[in-house]
């Protein structure tokens, strides 16, 4: 939340005389959707990438027979006696016993985010205008990507249930609320903005799963660590596919891609699970995010590093040909954002340290862990 407020407050470079001025700062949020919807790549240019997607994006998907499946990491009642099954579940309980409540909050938040996959598939399909049975490379990518992603929430949900550490009815309610609430990520119907947003979110999903894997291993649950690590590896592979796609789109239409990049950065783009609700806590996503920030699962600093990564991957500062005056102006803007974010991260860290040292500690109850309180 703090990050997006800072980005909105960060001004675009001053325009030269005669150039179209930037929208007034006070009206930017109101006019953001209209501005984003104006960043279009032509259908001719977009469809010219069909062959490229076939040979450079679909290759990031794995054949089903070579993919891990959730059952590979769960007790199998069809092959175990009742006593053996009980022993297997007790082993999971024992491994999970030392994991702190704050880590479980992050595990559940990550899993709930994964379980809202129907919303994400609908978002990408609506941006691309695909069909459920289409045969274009784009249609096949959406379905293949979604099929791989589906295993993530499935496995995490089942394993977390078996730990016995969670109020699964509250977790299940949270999932239903989140899918039912939909999502407005602030990218309008722009293909370019949609893909840039997805690049950030795939990488932003990889980071917390990798960090929860590290925490699970530290606290003795090597199986849960492996599960989180496998999910992180999938997310990293998917992020690489979308990153490669945007690199190609910057080649095909550098000006519109640059404008889209700036719009996504300056708009108050929401996180996928920002409408998270458990029927009790109206600020559940904020509280979950606070815990993630506190224990280092996902931080403002991670976001800053992501932006640095994409600026280098897409070689943003080196793009010269094909940019309009407005394109060059927003290029300067996005190249200056990492420094803005670093300063924001430093200020946020300073505030957290002061809060720790001054006044009473702040605790938040989470229904997912039977209303036990977690310090934030």
UniProtKB/Swiss-Prot annotation:
Expressed in which tissues: Preferentially expressed in the flower labellum.
Lineage top rank: taxon: Eukaryota
Binding site for Fe cation 2: 149, 202, 235, 238
Binding site for Fe cation 1: 114, 149, 152, 235
Organelle targeting sequence: 1-33
A GO MF term: stearoyl-[ACP] desaturase activity
EC number of this enzyme: 1.14.19.11, 1.14.19.2
Record's GO cellular component terms: chloroplast stroma
Chief location bin: plastid
Record's keyword annotation contains Lipid metabolism: yes
Primary role: Converts stearoyl-ACP to oleoyl-ACP by introduction of a cis double bond between carbons 9 and 10 of the acyl chain. Converts palmitoyl-ACP to (4Z)-hexadec-4-enoyl-ACP by introduction of a cis double bond between carbons 4 and 5 of the acyl chain. Catalyzes the desaturation of saturated fatty acid 18:0 and 16:0 to generate 18:1 (delta-9) and 16:1 (delta-4) intermediates, expected to give rise to 9-alkenes and 12-alkenes, respectively.
Protein name: Palmitoyl-[acyl-carrier-protein] 4-desaturase 2, chloroplastic
Species, as recorded: Ophrys arachnitiformis subsp. archipelagi (Orchid)
């Amino acid at each position: 939340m703090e990050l997006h407020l800072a980005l909105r407050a960060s001004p675009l470079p001053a325009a030269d005389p005669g150039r179209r001025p930037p929208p007034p700062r006070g009206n930017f949020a109101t006019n953001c959707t209209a501005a984003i919807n104006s960043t279009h790549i032509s259908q001719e240019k977009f469809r010219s990438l069909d062959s490229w997607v076939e040979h450079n994006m679909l290759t990031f998907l794995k054949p089903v027979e070579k993919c891990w499946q959730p059952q590979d990491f769960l007790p199998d009642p069809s092959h175990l006696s009742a006593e053996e099954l009980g022993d297997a579940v007790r082993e999971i309980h024992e491994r999970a016993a030392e994991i702190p409540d704050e880590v479980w909050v992050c595990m559940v938040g990550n899993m709930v985010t994964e379980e809202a996959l129907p919303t994400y598939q609908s978002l990408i399909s609506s941006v691309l205008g695909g069909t459920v049975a289409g045969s274009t490379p784009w249609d096949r990518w959406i379905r293949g990507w979604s099929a791989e992603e589906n295993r993530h929430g499935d496995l995490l949900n089942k394993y977390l249930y078996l730990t016995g550490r969670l109020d699964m009815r509250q977790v299940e309610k949270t999932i239903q609320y989140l899918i039912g609430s939909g999502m407005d990520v602030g990218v309008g119907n722009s293909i370019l903005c949609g893909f840039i947003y997805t690049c950030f979110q795939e990488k932003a999903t990889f980071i917390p799963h990798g960090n929860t894997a590290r925490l699970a291993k530290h606290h003795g649950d090597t199986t849960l660590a492996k599960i989180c690590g496998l999910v992180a590896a999938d997310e990293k592979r998917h992020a690489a596919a979308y990153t490669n796609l945007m690199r190609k789109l910057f080649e095909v239409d550098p000006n519109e891609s640059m404008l889209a990049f700036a719009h996504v950065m300056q708009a108050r783009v929401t996180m996928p699970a920002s409408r998270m609700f458990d029927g009790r806590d109206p600020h559940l996503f904020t509280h979950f995010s606070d815990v993630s920030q506190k224990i280092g699962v996902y931080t403002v600093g991670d976001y800053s590093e992501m932006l640095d990564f994409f600026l280098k991957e897409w070689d943003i500062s080196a793009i010269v040909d094909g940019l309009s005056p407005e394109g060059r102006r927003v290029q300067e803007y996005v190249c200056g954002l990492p420094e803005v974010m670093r300063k924001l991260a430093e200020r946020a860290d300073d505030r957290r340290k002061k809060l720790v040292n001054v006044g009473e500690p702040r605790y938040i109850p989470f229904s997912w862990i039977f209303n036990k309180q977690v310090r934030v």
